[in-house]
Amino acid sequence: MSWLTDRLRLLAGLIAVAALAAPSLDVWAQQGDAPKKPAQQAQQQQKPPAKPRPAPTKPGQSIASKTEALPPSQIGIGTLAKQAFMVDPQTSTVLLFKDADKPMHPSSMAKMMTIYIVFEELAAGRLKLDTKFRVSERARNMGGSRMFVELGSEVSVEDLIKGMIVLSGNDACVVVAEGLSGTEESFAERMTKKAKELGMTGSVFKNSSGWPAEGQWTTARDLAVLAWRTIDDFPQYYKYYSETNWIYNNIKQDNRNRLLRTTAGTDGLKTGHTEEGGYGQATSAIRDGRRLILVVNGMTSMAERAQETSRVMEWGFREFTNTTVFRAGDTVAEAPVWLGTQDKVPLVVPRMVQVTAPTGQAVSPRVIAKYDGPLPAPIAKGTKLGVAAVTLPDGRVIEYPLEAGADVPRKGVLGRVTAMIGHYLFGWWS
């Protein structure tokens, strides 16, 4: 009967703790999980080490991972581009890969990074759309495509954004670079640093406009990463990329992105051209809520660039579809709760979870909910509690956050003591 005596002593101790030191019990319940039984601890220690698995990534992040994987069907398409990269950013599925990690000249597609930094400054409140920058002689004398800013004039940030996007103004880029960093050289260093932060490991910038310069490189994949981060990070400013023409200084110019006028759903981003690198374009289009991003480079003419970009984009929408695994707010699993008024809490996805596969192919992704449980109460609705690991058709694992789908208050003192007594007295057989 010694075990019973020990249990009764423990019972008396717990009651004393509840009566005299309830606040301490509250803190313990918030900071830790429910106590494990000795038998469980022994079993856990005897388990062999798990086999290493590929590290999972978050949606969007795996666009930058060095993979050439296509969906299992290996549906392919030839392209005239020297470099090409197409991705569904919402599922991180690569649909087309051709020398996408090979260094290439960024040309005017480098302006996307200058614009990204401007958007970042606006979102942080360090800039306003009506903030004005003065035009230097260096900016005024820039060659190539221009906004036609006048020496000594002051131009608003909003006009400079349109000048960089719609008019592809090299002069506008220099005005921005000098306004934000003092010199274009310093701004280029900032561009390269930001590229590394975004996962653009193959990009080095030497100026703000993409003007040919020794040692300036990017990759098709890197530009796709930048395109997606622009769309996802700054939806309130991305609208500028869809403007088809603009008048500045009494000069009307059309956006060089012809797909804005010819290909359904196109809403950005940027074209580019250098003698050595050829004609290139980073394009994004959305149809029925599904977005594709395509980067091509090395075309021989503006016409070929427009035709090839449109053809490949149509192929991507036609040959692949997205299957919804979970809608926003759907419950993926229920997790046990320790010392809560409810025994379980629903784990929900805050955003839609989809899988990309060839059109007509049945999709049955494997989904595993990961969390550390039991989860200690109280739990507030919307609190991140774990992840849903979704295995895609190409074998990659993407992790989506799981949040509490409901509030779970903590039990009162008597309820907590009762739960703890039950755990210690009867946990052996539970």
What is each residue range found by the language model?
Residues G32-R221, W228-F234, N245-N249:
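Active-site-adjacent loops and short helices of periplasmic peptidoglycan-processing enzymes
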Residues A18-V27:
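C-terminal segment of classical bacterial N-terminal signal peptides
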Residues M1-A12:
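Bacterial N-terminal signal peptides that target proteins for export
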Residues T201-V204, P212-S430:
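Domain-terminus/edge residues, biased toward the C-terminal soluble/receptor-binding domains
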Residues I15, L70-P72, G280:
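A generic local structural motif
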